Amino acid sequence: MAHPLTRRKFNALTVALSSVWLASSLGLVVTANVAQAQAPKGPEFKLIKPDQTPDVEKGKIEVIEFFWFGCPHCNGLEPSVREWKKKLAPDVVFKRVHVPFREEKHQQLFYTLESMGKVEDMVDKVFYAMHVEHNPLDNNKKMVEWATKQGLDAKLFEQTLESFGVKTKMKKASNLAAAHQVDGVPALTVNGKFYTAPSMAGSNGHALRLVDQFVEQERKAKK
Protein backbone atom coordinates (compact mmCIF):
# COMPACT_ATOMS: atom_id res chain seq x y z
CA MET A 1 0.00 0.00 0.00
CA ALA A 2 1.26 3.46 -0.81
CA HIS A 3 2.35 5.51 2.18
CA PRO A 4 1.37 9.13 2.80
CA LEU A 5 3.67 11.91 1.69
CA THR A 6 5.68 13.36 4.55
CA ARG A 7 8.13 16.21 4.71
CA ARG A 8 11.03 13.79 4.52
CA LYS A 9 9.58 11.95 1.54
CA PHE A 10 8.78 15.09 -0.48
CA ASN A 11 12.44 15.52 -1.36
CA ALA A 12 12.35 12.16 -3.13
CA LEU A 13 9.66 13.30 -5.58
CA THR A 14 10.70 14.13 -9.12
CA VAL A 15 9.61 17.27 -10.97
CA ALA A 16 7.31 15.15 -13.13
CA LEU A 17 4.66 14.37 -10.56
CA SER A 18 3.34 11.28 -12.32
CA SER A 19 3.30 8.66 -9.58
CA VAL A 20 0.22 6.48 -9.35
CA TRP A 21 -1.17 5.47 -6.01
CA LEU A 22 -0.92 1.65 -5.79
CA ALA A 23 -4.01 -0.26 -4.83
CA SER A 24 -4.11 -1.36 -1.22
CA SER A 25 -2.99 -4.92 -0.55
CA LEU A 26 -4.41 -5.10 2.93
CA GLY A 27 -7.59 -6.82 1.77
CA LEU A 28 -9.67 -4.75 4.15
CA VAL A 29 -13.34 -5.69 4.26
CA VAL A 30 -15.92 -3.03 5.00
CA THR A 31 -18.47 -4.44 7.41
CA ALA A 32 -21.78 -3.23 8.66
CA ASN A 33 -19.94 -1.63 11.56
CA VAL A 34 -18.84 1.18 9.28
CA ALA A 35 -22.40 2.44 9.14
CA GLN A 36 -22.80 2.47 12.90
CA ALA A 37 -22.32 5.56 15.02
CA GLN A 38 -19.72 3.98 17.31
CA ALA A 39 -16.17 4.80 16.17
CA PRO A 40 -13.97 1.82 15.28
CA LYS A 41 -10.93 0.87 17.33
CA GLY A 42 -7.75 0.46 15.35
CA PRO A 43 -5.10 2.02 13.12
CA GLU A 44 -7.61 3.22 10.52
CA PHE A 45 -7.85 6.54 12.34
CA LYS A 46 -6.42 8.46 15.26
CA LEU A 47 -7.79 10.94 17.76
CA ILE A 48 -6.47 14.50 17.61
CA LYS A 49 -5.14 15.51 21.01
CA PRO A 50 -5.92 18.10 22.10
CA ASP A 51 -9.20 18.51 20.23
CA GLN A 52 -9.32 21.46 17.85
CA THR A 53 -12.32 23.79 17.91
CA PRO A 54 -14.17 23.63 14.57
CA ASP A 55 -14.51 26.96 12.77
CA VAL A 56 -18.16 26.52 11.82
CA GLU A 57 -21.57 27.75 12.92
CA LYS A 58 -23.17 26.13 15.94
CA GLY A 59 -24.80 22.85 15.00
CA LYS A 60 -22.59 22.33 11.96
CA ILE A 61 -19.99 19.58 11.56
CA GLU A 62 -16.62 20.42 10.02
CA VAL A 63 -14.79 18.08 7.65
CA ILE A 64 -11.35 19.17 6.44
CA GLU A 65 -9.29 17.69 3.63
CA PHE A 66 -5.62 18.58 4.06
CA PHE A 67 -3.88 18.29 0.71
CA TRP A 68 -1.14 19.49 -1.63
CA PHE A 69 -1.67 20.17 -5.34
CA GLY A 70 1.61 18.44 -6.19
CA CYS A 71 0.72 15.24 -4.35
CA PRO A 72 -0.22 12.35 -6.67
CA HIS A 73 -2.21 10.73 -3.84
CA CYS A 74 -4.30 13.90 -3.47
CA ASN A 75 -4.88 13.92 -7.21
CA GLY A 76 -6.04 10.30 -6.95
CA LEU A 77 -8.43 11.11 -4.12
CA GLU A 78 -10.05 14.09 -5.84
CA PRO A 79 -12.61 12.17 -7.99
CA SER A 80 -13.83 10.31 -4.89
CA VAL A 81 -14.10 13.54 -2.91
CA ARG A 82 -16.01 15.17 -5.75
CA GLU A 83 -18.65 12.41 -5.73
CA TRP A 84 -18.75 12.23 -1.93
CA LYS A 85 -19.41 15.98 -1.64
CA LYS A 86 -22.58 15.65 -3.73
CA LYS A 87 -24.19 13.61 -0.95
CA LEU A 88 -23.25 15.81 2.00
CA ALA A 89 -26.02 16.71 4.43
CA PRO A 90 -26.75 20.42 5.03
CA ASP A 91 -25.17 20.29 8.48
CA VAL A 92 -21.75 19.25 7.13
CA VAL A 93 -19.24 21.95 6.15
CA PHE A 94 -16.46 20.65 3.90
CA LYS A 95 -13.21 22.61 3.67
CA ARG A 96 -9.96 22.18 1.79
CA VAL A 97 -6.74 23.23 3.50
CA HIS A 98 -3.59 23.34 1.39
CA VAL A 99 -0.52 22.37 3.40
CA PRO A 100 2.85 24.13 2.98
CA PHE A 101 4.87 20.95 2.40
CA ARG A 102 7.77 21.35 -0.02
CA GLU A 103 6.27 23.85 -2.46
CA GLU A 104 4.73 26.96 -0.89
CA LYS A 105 3.97 28.34 -4.35
CA HIS A 106 1.26 25.71 -4.71
CA GLN A 107 -0.25 26.81 -1.41
CA GLN A 108 -0.07 30.39 -2.66
CA LEU A 109 -1.85 29.36 -5.88
CA PHE A 110 -4.66 27.67 -3.98
CA TYR A 111 -5.35 30.64 -1.72
CA THR A 112 -5.14 33.03 -4.65
CA LEU A 113 -7.87 31.06 -6.41
CA GLU A 114 -9.87 30.90 -3.19
CA SER A 115 -9.57 34.67 -2.69
CA MET A 116 -10.84 35.18 -6.23
CA GLY A 117 -13.80 32.87 -5.64
CA LYS A 118 -12.52 30.46 -8.29
CA VAL A 119 -11.11 27.57 -6.29
CA GLU A 120 -13.93 25.06 -6.86
CA ASP A 121 -13.92 25.82 -10.58
CA MET A 122 -10.16 25.42 -10.84
CA VAL A 123 -9.13 22.59 -8.49
CA ASP A 124 -9.51 19.89 -11.14
CA LYS A 125 -7.74 22.06 -13.71
CA VAL A 126 -4.76 22.61 -11.42
CA PHE A 127 -4.45 18.88 -10.77
CA TYR A 128 -4.70 18.24 -14.52
CA ALA A 129 -2.01 20.79 -15.30
CA MET A 130 0.39 19.30 -12.78
CA HIS A 131 -0.24 15.58 -13.10
CA VAL A 132 -1.26 15.18 -16.75
CA GLU A 133 0.41 18.08 -18.52
CA HIS A 134 3.39 17.99 -16.10
CA ASN A 135 3.31 21.74 -15.64
CA PRO A 136 4.82 22.26 -12.15
CA LEU A 137 3.28 25.73 -11.66
CA ASP A 138 6.15 26.48 -9.31
CA ASN A 139 6.73 30.17 -9.97
CA ASN A 140 4.66 33.30 -10.56
CA LYS A 141 5.30 33.44 -14.30
CA LYS A 142 4.04 29.90 -14.89
CA MET A 143 1.04 30.46 -12.64
CA VAL A 144 0.04 33.72 -14.34
CA GLU A 145 0.39 32.12 -17.79
CA TRP A 146 -1.71 29.16 -16.69
CA ALA A 147 -4.38 31.39 -15.08
CA THR A 148 -4.64 33.47 -18.25
CA LYS A 149 -5.24 30.32 -20.32
CA GLN A 150 -8.08 29.44 -17.95
CA GLY A 151 -9.76 32.75 -18.71
CA LEU A 152 -8.86 34.48 -15.45
CA ASP A 153 -7.96 38.16 -15.36
CA ALA A 154 -4.15 38.11 -15.45
CA LYS A 155 -3.70 41.46 -13.72
CA LEU A 156 -6.15 40.64 -10.92
CA PHE A 157 -4.63 37.19 -10.51
CA GLU A 158 -1.11 38.58 -10.20
CA GLN A 159 -2.21 41.25 -7.72
CA THR A 160 -4.07 38.70 -5.62
CA LEU A 161 -1.13 36.30 -5.75
CA GLU A 162 1.09 38.71 -3.83
CA SER A 163 -1.62 40.18 -1.62
CA PHE A 164 -1.56 40.40 2.15
CA GLY A 165 -4.84 38.51 2.24
CA VAL A 166 -3.34 35.47 0.52
CA LYS A 167 -0.29 35.50 2.78
CA THR A 168 -2.62 35.61 5.79
CA LYS A 169 -4.60 32.63 4.47
CA MET A 170 -1.37 30.70 3.91
CA LYS A 171 -0.21 31.31 7.46
CA LYS A 172 -3.58 30.32 8.88
CA ALA A 173 -3.58 27.11 6.82
CA SER A 174 -0.09 26.20 7.96
CA ASN A 175 -1.04 26.75 11.60
CA LEU A 176 -4.20 24.70 11.13
CA ALA A 177 -2.25 21.79 9.65
CA ALA A 178 0.17 21.88 12.57
CA ALA A 179 -2.65 22.01 15.12
CA HIS A 180 -4.31 18.97 13.50
CA GLN A 181 -0.94 17.16 13.55
CA VAL A 182 -0.88 16.62 9.80
CA ASP A 183 2.29 14.76 8.83
CA GLY A 184 1.22 13.52 5.42
CA VAL A 185 -1.36 14.13 2.72
CA PRO A 186 -4.09 13.57 1.86
CA ALA A 187 -5.58 13.59 5.35
CA LEU A 188 -9.17 14.00 6.51
CA THR A 189 -10.38 15.34 9.85
CA VAL A 190 -13.81 15.61 11.43
CA ASN A 191 -14.70 18.34 13.92
CA GLY A 192 -11.12 18.66 15.07
CA LYS A 193 -11.36 15.27 16.81
CA PHE A 194 -10.92 12.45 14.31
CA TYR A 195 -8.07 12.02 11.82
CA THR A 196 -7.92 9.48 9.01
CA ALA A 197 -6.35 9.09 5.59
CA PRO A 198 -6.55 6.66 2.67
CA SER A 199 -3.14 5.31 3.72
CA MET A 200 -4.55 4.53 7.18
CA ALA A 201 -7.96 3.27 6.06
CA GLY A 202 -6.67 1.17 3.17
CA SER A 203 -8.45 2.95 0.32
CA ASN A 204 -10.00 6.25 -0.72
CA GLY A 205 -13.51 4.87 -0.37
CA HIS A 206 -13.01 3.44 3.09
CA ALA A 207 -11.43 6.67 4.33
CA LEU A 208 -14.51 8.60 3.22
CA ARG A 209 -16.82 6.01 4.79
CA LEU A 210 -14.97 6.50 8.06
CA VAL A 211 -15.47 10.24 7.71
CA ASP A 212 -19.21 9.64 7.27
CA GLN A 213 -19.18 7.48 10.39
CA PHE A 214 -17.44 10.16 12.45
CA VAL A 215 -19.87 12.77 11.13
CA GLU A 216 -22.79 10.63 12.25
CA GLN A 217 -21.21 10.15 15.66
CA GLU A 218 -20.78 13.91 16.05
CA ARG A 219 -24.33 14.51 14.87
CA LYS A 220 -25.74 12.15 17.49
CA ALA A 221 -23.56 13.67 20.19
CA LYS A 222 -25.16 17.06 19.55
CA LYS A 223 -28.67 15.78 20.20
Identify the meaning behind each predicted range.
Residues 2-103, 216-223:
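Extracytoplasmic thiol/disulfide redox context detector
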Residues 5, 9, 149-223:
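C-terminal cap of thioredoxin/glutaredoxin-like
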Residues 38-48, 135, 140-141, 210:
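Periplasmic c-type cytochrome electron-transfer domains
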Residues 67-70, 81, 85-88, 113-117, ...:
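Sec/Tat-exported extracytoplasmic proteins
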Residues 70-73, 100-104, 128-133, 163-166, ...:
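Solvent-exposed loop/turn segments at secondary-structure junctions
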Residues 78-85, 106-110, 123, 140, ...:
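Extracytoplasmic/secreted envelope proteins and their assembly/folding machinery
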Residues 87-116, 120-147:
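Structural microenvironment flanking redox-active thiols in thiol-disulfide oxidoreductases
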